[in-house]
């Protein structure tokens, strides 16, 4: 499918950024999740066009004029990020939703 190839291309660009550019920038991201993880999760959870819109919107917020904070991809929760053994952006199966422990 053409869309999945394009989505894979954009995921590859994000991984390239993480590997080749991000280590040299120094300052940590102001947001949780980081902008690169946000991009990977958006590409995983939403259609390509919506993902690109969400990523662009997030990157426009990234700068010294913004305080930062928690800014999750729509249709995700903090619990999903915190309970996942691997980052949501890296999980092998899109259908896998991390479970949360229930207290009795």
Curated annotation (Swiss-Prot):
SMART domains: Haemolytic (SM01234). Pfam families: YidD. Signal peptide: none annotated. Keywords: Cell inner membrane, Cell membrane, Membrane. InterPro entries: Membr_insert_effic_factor_YidD. Transmembrane segments: none annotated. GO terms for cellular component: plasma membrane. The keyword Ligase does not apply. The keyword Cell membrane applies. It is found in: Cell inner membrane. It is a peripheral membrane protein. Residues 83-104 are annotated as: Disordered. Belongs to the UPF0161 family. Could be involved in insertion of integral membrane proteins into the membrane. This is Putative membrane protein insertion efficiency factor. It comes from Chlamydia trachomatis serovar D (strain ATCC VR-885 / DSM 19411 / UW-3/Cx).
